[in-house]
Amino acid sequence: YLPYARHDRPMHNFDSHALKVFCNLINSLNFTSVIIHDCHSDVGIGLLNNCANVSQDILLSHLTDNILNINDIDYIIAPDNGAVKKASKIAEKFKLPLITCLKERDLATGHIIKYRILDPIEKPGKALIVDDICDGGATFNILAKSLKEDTPITEISLYVTHGIFSKGLNELFENIDHIYSYHPWIEDERLNT
């Protein structure tokens, strides 16, 4: 996990570029290699010297070998524009259709204003939402609720590489059937790792 990875650009006037500051600190230690698992964006990889990124599709493959039966999945869901590139790679790797979603967030409050499902889902099936980080989980909870209400999706799973789960899992399980994380930050018997 790369701290401050989501701060890959200043969000407001007078913000520091926190990711750049952190990467400068790591670079000052002169490591011969720095390995990141599923970096939030290419910005973090570019700011670190001698950096290797293990991509999300490789990490997810480790779970599909042991825990997650990818043959049970009918759709890969990209929860926002930032996840499309990685989700596309996963959809292509497992030969599944990609469904792209779009959220609008109020930068001042962090709350999601809107959620739209951009691609049609015409047949019932099981969906896997994929992303790099889950902090509190509101994004995924709102998306899962929209998918269940507005599409014929019958079951929803969530895969995140870095599962912070700062608000626990109870709210997520209101709308999500299975949760998978490569690096969970909490212990919970309902979590698949």
Set out the residue ranges of the language-model regions.
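PRPP-associated nucleotide enzymes
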Residues: 1-193
